């Protein structure tokens, strides 16, 4: 028998009880005799017990299905966020490469090849982490979102709408939609 054709002990007992009850009802109907009140009472009890067992079996099946679904979700989350700690350790490396590029003297011809090397290294690192679901949070001129931004200061600005990101002090990152680090930003406010 295949695994789907095999029956659990509860299913076997339920089927046996059902078959017995059906046989008794058929025998009674065929004979057409007046049934002893005790037999009728036992048939009712048997029918009630059979119904309770069916309901119990359905509840058990539903519980097993719920456990299976929860386990699948837990495994999926574990796969999705297994890189979270490792990714958090890479963020300072990305920050340091960006700072090195910001402070490098781009007018010095002797440093141009080194600067290009750092730029390529940073680009390849960002491409590599991007393949695993890490995304940068660092846009300006977007509405302030406390779920991904950390406001460091508020500045008056005529160029920006109120409550919008004016400047990013440190980029934030998400891993598959989950925040690794909020972006540290300056938020605009209306001129008073």
Curated annotation (Swiss-Prot):
InterPro entries: GrpE, GrpE_coiled_coil, GrpE_head. Keywords: Chaperone, Cytoplasm, Stress response. Its main location: cytoplasm. It comes from the Bacteria. Residues 20-31 have a biased composition (Polar residues). Belongs to the GrpE family. This is Protein GrpE. It comes from Yersinia pestis. The lineage of its organism: Bacteria, Pseudomonadati, Pseudomonadota, Gammaproteobacteria, Enterobacterales. The gene is grpE.
